[in-house]
Amino acid sequence: MSGESGFKNKSISEIVKEIYENIDGMTMSGKKDGNSNIGGFIATRHKEWYDKASIVNIIYEGYVTYGGMTGRDMGAMAQGLNESMDFEYLKSRCKQVEYLANKLDKYGVPFQRPFGEHALFIDAKKILGHIPIDDLIAQTLAIEIYLEGGVGSVEIGTLLADRDPITQEN
């Protein structure tokens, strides 16, 4: 793992704190970044952004006054966030992604480069180009990976991008 020289002697939590001090807003999934089983959050410094997000949030979580996570789940996320600040843990995650990238390279599986320290994105269209877009190529690949190897993945493709609001096409 490499990084910026100005952060070489800072802890992960010091780096994260500095990043958060310089942002206007963020989203976070607890399942990935928070090392917990459920939840996530939206944070912003801007009241107008908060108000807009709160309206959209109703669709997915309910009103901000009663929807959302249980106390147990918030505690699990808090614990997961603390554990995620451990350098050895983060190094291990990065090594896992690097290991996967090396295996995919060995077998000629196309993926986006450079790969991240958080995830690796397989190019489903290159693998399953014979499948029509409307049949959700990335979703199909995610399902097949699970059926074949028991590995859970997520599609970041046609389904996630939603349909064009005018044409209703993917």
From Swiss-Prot:
Pfam families: Beta_elim_lyase. Signal peptide: none annotated. It comes from the Eukaryota. Its cofactor is pyridoxal 5'-phosphate. It comes from Dictyostelium discoideum (Social amoeba). Belongs to the beta-eliminating lyase family. One of its GO terms (molecular function) is lyase activity. The keyword Cytoplasm does not apply. PANTHER family: BETA-ELIMINATING LYASE-LIKE PROTEIN-RELATED, TRYPTOPHANASE. Coiled coil: none annotated. This is Putative beta-eliminating lyase-like protein. Gene3D superfamilies: Aspartate Aminotransferase, domain 1 (3.90.1150.10). SUPFAM superfamilies: PLP-dependent transferases (SSF53383). Keywords: Pyridoxal phosphate. GO terms for biological process: amino acid metabolic process. The modification N6-(pyridoxal phosphate)lysine is found at K32.
